[in-house]
From Swiss-Prot:
Reaction(s) catalysed by this chain's protein: chorismate + L-glutamine = anthranilate + pyruvate + L-glutamate + H(+)
Keywords: Amino-acid biosynthesis, Aromatic amino acid biosynthesis, Glutamine amidotransferase, Lyase, Tryptophan biosynthesis
Transmembrane regions: none
Gene3D superfamilies: 3.40.50.880
InterPro entries the record matches: Anth_synth/Amidotransfase, Class_I_gatase-like, GATASE, TrpG/PapA_dom
Name of the protein in its database record: Anthranilate synthase component 2
Cellular component terms per the entry's GO annotation: cytosol
Lineage, uppermost ranks: Archaea, Methanobacteriati, Methanobacteriota, Methanomada group, Methanobacteria
Gene: trpG
Record pathway: Amino-acid biosynthesis; L-tryptophan biosynthesis; L-tryptophan from chorismate: step 1/5
Length: 196
């Protein structure tokens, strides 16, 4: 049985997420299988049959509003709200968009390290506040258009949304890259997700 499914949005960072998750599982003594599928390799019915316990939607190029960029991921967000689901970068933007938020062009950042301020919620347990995180993105989730079902859980000093969670479901998003070497606390964030 696949316990953790990573959906790859054709991004090189997906391998880093896979490697980080695998290291954490080994360190925690968890014998869980991780499967990686590209966003156009499976239909939602195939994923239902896999019945993963946790899902990570990877970073990637493009816009979550375009199926050509986001593949099956929007369907996954709609279908699997009953289990822990984490979106990273494009995955985060897709979650925000799926629940009615506006995702727009922002200032492009590539490898920029910033301080992130968080609310101490479950993903940020044992994470310093603030902490340093690496950003690679050109789209941003607009704070003024945050859906009622979504809670902002982390921001930069200039109020750019860095993390969200659904108010009812175990659905989370991270704009920053926890798998980056420039995000020292990223391992703790991913560990907190995998422990859910």
């Amino acid at each position: 049985m696949v316990v953790i499914l990573i959906i790859d949005n054709y991004d090189s960072f997906t391998h880093n997420l896979y490697q980080l998750a695998g290291e954490i599982l080994r360190d925690e003594g968890m014998d869980e299988e991780i499967m990686v599928l590209r966003n156009d390799e499976a239909r939602i019915s195939d994923l239902r049959a896999l019945d993963p316990e946790k899902i990570i939607i990877s970073p990637g190029p493009g816009n979550p509003s375009r199926r050509s960029d986001f593949g099956v991921c929007m369907d996954v967000i709609g279908e699997f709200t009953d289990r822990p689901l984490l979106g990273v970068c494009l995955g985060h933007q897709g979650i925000f968009h799926a629940f009615g938020g506006r995702v727009d062009q922002g200032e492009p950042v590539h490898g920029k390290i910033v301080e992130v301020f968080h609310d101490g919620s479950e993903l940020f347990r044992d994470v310093p506040n603030p902490f340093r995180a690496t950003r690679y993105h050109s789209l941003v989730c607009r704070p003024e258009d945050t859906p009622a079902d979504i809670e902002v859980t982390a921001v930069t000093s200039d109020e750019i949304i860095m993390a969200i969670k659904h108010r009812e479901y175990p659905v989370y998003g991270l704009q920053f890259h926890p798998e980056s070497a420039g995000t020292p606390s990223g391992r703790t964030v991913i560990r907190n997700f995998l422990r859910m």
